[in-house]
């Protein structure tokens, strides 16, 4: 290999490029909906058994480019790219490590998610019960059920937060969680699944907040 040759990378660069365009299109829609304010939020898709395609930190989600999606290993280290991924990358990779079937993780910061995280922080969770839209979640085939969405305390120590998430995953199945004053993580086996879970939670959280207002609690 001569001095100007590019070293081979341990993942399919064409696949990374495909995923970048797939993610960018979806993220742009989320940005237009107001779910990614002030360059917040991060999004990822499984690249292969050992790597994940993920957005770099600090980019305006309304105008991402292909180079704003990089590859990281399952420990969250950038592979073949000079950019340092967000510290929150760990919250993505822990899910890919734990669940080989998971294909996509979405982290958003909508107004509804952030307000709900504040309102229910004291309880530590929000219970969504008897909504028809609960059938949008993998494993739910009836509205006659309850879905508990955890609310974790915000912290800059991602190792602590990841450990708390892992502990709860040992006890219950879930497709998303809130972080107090921060936002929401959702995931699924495919991008379509993760997006469906995100949209369902966004709608149901809005319903719960509106009900609190109608009852005079907010």
Curated annotation (Swiss-Prot):
Gene Ontology CC terms, in alphabetical order: cytoplasm
BP terms from Gene Ontology: L-methionine salvage from methylthioadenosine; monosaccharide metabolic process
Domain of life according to the entry: Bacteria
Keyword Amino-acid biosynthesis recorded: yes
UniProtKB keywords: Amino-acid biosynthesis, Lyase, Metal-binding, Methionine biosynthesis, Zinc
Any one Gene Ontology molecular-function term assigned to this protein's record: methylthioribulose 1-phosphate dehydratase activity
EC number assigned by the record: 4.2.1.109
Pfam families listed in its UniProt record: Aldolase_II
InterPro entries assigned: Aldolase_II/adducin_N, Aldolase_II/adducin_N_sf, MethylthioRu-1-P_deHdtase_MtnB
Residues holding Zn(2+): 107, 109
Broad class of enzyme this protein falls into: lyase
Catalysis: reaction(s): 5-(methylsulfanyl)-D-ribulose 1-phosphate = 5-methylsulfanyl-2,3-dioxopentyl phosphate + H2O
Cofactor: Zn(2+)
Family: Belongs to the aldolase class II family. MtnB subfamily.
HAMAP family: Salvage_MtnB (MF_01677)
Name the record gives this protein: Methylthioribulose-1-phosphate dehydratase
Lineage summary: Bacteria, Pseudomonadati, Pseudomonadota, Gammaproteobacteria, Lysobacterales
